[in-house]
Every structure is written in structure tokens, then in C-alpha cells.
A protein has these predicted regions:
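Feature captures the catalytic ectodomains and active-site-proximal regions of enzymes
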Residues: 1-399
Length: 399
């Protein structure tokens, strides 16, 4: 038996007038997921525990069978694991976005235009981070390039600070959301002076792209300690994701991380490559469990792009779910597959919410026969609800 999770980050949403009162998941053409729903079980699951911020780190830990309330030490330390950062117990790790701020006002009066700087390429971002390193790196502060707009700062023997995610405050004046810590705030203000007229940003502006003109700190935490996935489940696990956060969780859990060329975490990602990596992990490399994480629905939700969010869901269905299921069937391999979001990223608010999300669980050896569509409404109508998301993995593993 092979076990598969396909995670559409932020895929759940609310009914939208632009879609005739349907959610993006309802509006999208998803024959593969509908087939799973027709032959399997649907329900709702609460991946974000009450009182915790609805971040992808918390929600994905839940989906992977970890209770965030007992094992979560911050988002950034998990991301740091994926880029090989060595951490000491008293180090503080920060996520360090390169963001787009307005240019006319004093720093505290600027607004956040884009938390992702137009989904800047990793190559461009690395050039900007090198300028940051040249100005800021020393024995106390170290900066590491991640993927696209997502980077890491380590503050040796530092202290935790209250910080706000930039994607929660798009278009808003930043003053009320800046760090109270004078060191962090000073770095952010100075970063604007370094980055705004950097050659990379001047070229991006000339091409009509958004500048990545400031650092933004958030998601601080300390060195993580996760129970090993194999020790916990008895299974050899594989992670396929473009996002450092998920790769870091996998590293911390002792799972095999697959690097997929062209995996960007956006609509232009290598969908087929990610599906093939999962197929290879399960059918060639001896893995029992594959976790395929698709970031695009979340990014489209943050950007408020309705058509593109629908498209991302259709791509997930036709270019990931369908080929994986087909490959398992062609190989004569019994499998159980769980498809779900980690959290909603509603177009209306352009950030995460803590609401329950719909799941579909299919077992190739126990097919039911009914007509169903994988949607929020139909999943809710089943009356099945898991209030603690981390127990759903045991359901997938039939424990």
C-alpha cells in the first residue's frame, strides 16, 4: 500500500460573485478529484488549532500528523533547515521577505504593495540578498538566500520579537506593523536605502515589474525538534515542494526531499515534474508515503486573482492528481490518497483564515459508488468533521 497527500495550499475559499456565487473549488473543472470524492470519503478538518495563527507552517504540521501545540517553535527555523542553516538553541531565526513598498513617503508611512515583490526570481533575489549581506552580515547577524522572495536571518543569541506577516497587511500603511525592536526596525529602514535603487530593482522597474525594495521580518522562532516521520509512522516518506518551509519540515522529520527543476511555487511551476517526482519516489525509490505540496492556489489568493486561482486548482487536478492516480493504477499498486488544503486563503481578504477545510480520502481497495464533487459545500454536508487536524493522518494510514 502506498500513501499520498496532495496539498493545495490555500485552495479553500468563499463563494464569489465573480464566479456566480461559487467558490473557486466549486467553479473549477476537477474530474480527477471528483472521481476520488465519488469513490471515497469527504469531510471537513480543522488544521489550525484555536488560538494559533493560521500560517502554512502550523497547518501543514497538522496535515503531516504533528500536533502544532506541542512541536511548533516558529516558522523560520523550519525554513532554515531546508537551506542548511546551523542553529544553536539560543539563536533566533527570522523569515526575511523582500517586499514591495511605496516609494514617495517616509519609511513608516509607506504601504505594502506586494509581499512577494511580483514573485521575484531566486536569482534576482540572491543578488539583492548579497547586497544585504555585504552591509549587515557579522558575527551576530547572518543572512541566507532562500527561494524567490523568502529568505532567512539568524540573530545569534538574540531575542524573540512580536512581528507581523506582510501578507496580512497588503495596501496598508506599515507604521503600526513595524517591529518595536530598534535593531530589527533599523535593519528594515536601512534595507530600503540599500535595495530601492539597486541595479536589479532599476532593471525590474524598467521592465514594468515591482521592485523588491525592503526587507520584512516575521515568523521568528528557535531551533525546532520534530519526532522522526519514520519512527512515528513506520513509513519512508518523501516531500515534493517548491517552498523552503515544507522542505524544512521534511528535513526536520527525516523525510527525503525531492528537488524538482522548474518548481517555482506559483502558477508557472513544473506541475508534471512534481507529479513525476512523487511517482518515482513511490514506485522506484522505495518510499511508502509522498507529500506533494502545491503553493499556487495560496499565491493566487494572496494576489486576489480569481481566474488564476481557479486555473491553479484545475492544474492541480489534471497535472498532479490525475497522473499520480493513473500511475498507481497502471503499476497495479494499492494506494490511499488524501487531497486537501492546509487552510483557506480567501480572495476577499487576500490572506489566510483559520476556518476548517474540505478533504477527500480515497482508498483504491475500497471504492464506494456515489456521485459527488469535491467542494467545500459537499464536504461540509457529509457531517464528518475532524476538530484536530493532526489525527487525519492516522485515518489516511488506516491506523
Amino acid at each position: 500500500m502506498k500513501y499520498i497527500v496532495v496539498l493545495g495550499d490555500g485552495m479553500a475559499d468563499e463563494p464569489l460573485a465573480a464566479l456566480g456565487g461559487k467558490t473557486p473549488l466549486e467553479y473549477a473543472k476537477t474530474p480527477a478529484m471528483d472521481a476520488l470524492a465519488s469513490g471515497g470519503e469527504m469531510g471537513m478538518v480543522q488544521n489550525v488549532p484555536q488560538g494559533m495563527h493560521p500560517g502554512s507552517e502550523v497547518a501543514n504540521l497538522s496535515v503531516m500528523g504533528y500536533d502544532p501545540k506541542t512541536c511548533f517553535t516558529g516558522r523560520s527555523p523550519l525554513e532554515a533547515l531546508s537551506v542548511g542553516v546551523k542553529m544553536e538553541p539560543d539563536d533566533i531565526i527570522f523569515r526575511c521577505n523582500v517586499v514591495t513598498l511605496t516609494e514617495e513617503e517616509p519609511y513608516a508611512e509607506k504601504r505594502i504593495l506586494d509581499h512577494s515583490s511580483g514573485e521575484i526570481s531566486t536569482e534576482e533575489a540572491d543578488a539583492l540578498m548579497e547586497a544585504i549581506r555585504q552591509n549587515f552580515n557579522d558575527d551576530t547577524f547572518q543572512f541566507y538566500t532562500g527561494t524567490s522572495y523568502r529568505h532567512i536571518m539568524v540573530w545569534k543569541h538574540g531575542h524573540l520579537a512580536k512581528l507581523e506577516p506582510p501578507h496580512d497587511h497588503l495596501t496598508q500603511v506599515i507604521g503600526p506593523f513595524l517591529p518595536e525592536d530598534p535593531v530589527l526596525r533599523g535593519f528594515m529602514e536601512r534595507s530600503y536605502e540599500i535595495l530601492n535603487n539597486h541595479p536589479v530593482n532599476l532593471r525590474r522597474a524598467a521592465e514594468g515589474k515591482r521592485k523588491a525594495n525592503s526587507l520584512w521580518y516575521w515568523g521568528a522562532g528557535t531551533k525546532p525538534s520534530l519526532p522522526g516521520f519514520t519512527e512515528k509512522t513506520g513509513l519512508k516518506g518523501a516531500m515534493i515542494s517548491a517552498v523552503d518551509l515544507l522542505k524544512g519540515i521534511a528535513v526536520g522529520a527525516g523525510m527525503q526531499v525531492y528537488q524538482v527543476p522548474g518548481a517555482t511555487g506559483s502558477l508557472d511551476t513544473n506541475w508534471e515534474g512534481k507529479a513525476q517526482a512523487a511517482i518515482d519516489a513511490l514506485l522506484k525509490d522505495g518510499c511508502d508515503f509522498a507529500y506533494i505540496h502545491l503553493e499556487a492556489p495560496d499565491e493566487m489568493g494572496h494576489q486576489g486573482l480569481v481566474k488564476e486561482k481557479v486555473q491553479s486548482i484545475e492544474y492541480l487536478d489534471s497535472r498532479v492528481v490525475a497522473p499520480i492516480c493513473h500511475a498507481m493504477e497502471q503499476a497495479g499498486e494499492d494506494y490511499r490518497i488524501l487531497v486537501l488544503p492546509d487552510h483557506p486563503t480567501p480572495i476577499r481578504i487576500r490572506t489566510h483564515s483559520s476556518d476548517p477545510v474540505p478533504y477527500v480520502l480515497y482508498d483504491s481497495t475500497r471504492q464506494e459508488k456515489k456521485r459527488a464533487h469535491y467542494t467545500e459545500a459537499e464536504a461540509q454536508a457529509t457531517g464528518i468533521f475532524y476538530p484536530q487536524g493532526y489525527v487525519l493522518l492516522d485515518k489516511l494510514l488506516n491506523k
